[in-house]
Design a protein with these regions (language model features):
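Conserved ATP-binding/catalytic core of the eukaryotic-like protein kinase fold
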Residues: 1-161
């Protein structure tokens, strides 16, 4: 849904990923809500297997997220070259579960888990794209503070939704 660009944070001297809401979607309330939901979801998550959010804002009418730049390839791209070995599968699966476990413990359900939303980096697998995430109550989160998503068709990829 968003456009992602590689950028340089000159203040902190690091490469970052900047995700913007395209101008043709910025007037769409549903697209804006989804973009904001992604920011809220990942802002509460700090885990080595989840892409880190550094900043969120709006400049010149453009909504943006500044995130950790992930070098590597998506699991989808990797699988196009063939299956993972047993060892790779266990390592990747464990890392994905660790990231999901953190998200779930924090009350965030990803809802769009698929190989294209998992980045394989030198340090391990990282979950990305929480645009369809849903907040759910946990014992640490009062239900009254959560915004639930709209009813209707299910979200996510048809094969995994």
């Amino acid at each position: 849904m968003g456009e992602v660009y590689r950028a340089r944070d000159t203040r902190l001297e690091r490469t970052v990923a900047v995700k913007i809401l395209p101008s043709h979607l910025s007037e769409n309330p549903e697209a804006k809500q989804r973009f904001d939901r992604e920011a809220r979801a990942i802002s509460s998550l700090n885990h080595p297997n989840i892409c880190t959010l550094f900043d969120v804002g709006q400049q010149g009418g453009v909504d943006y997220l500044v995130m950790e730049f992930l070098e590597g390839e998506t699991l989808a791209d990797r699988l196009r070259r063939g299956p993972l070995t047993g060892e790779q599968l266990l390592k990747c699966g464990n890392e994905i579960c660790e990231g999901l476990g953190k998200a779930h413990k924090t009350g965030v359900i990803h809802r769009d888990l698929k190989p294209g939303n998992i980045m394989l980096t030198k340090t391990g697998a990282k979950l990305m794209d929480f645009g369809l995430a849903k907040a759910v109550p946990t014992h640490e989160t009062p239900a009254s503070s959560l915004t639930m998503t709209l009813s209707g068709p299910s979200a996510g990829h048809p094969l995994t939704a």
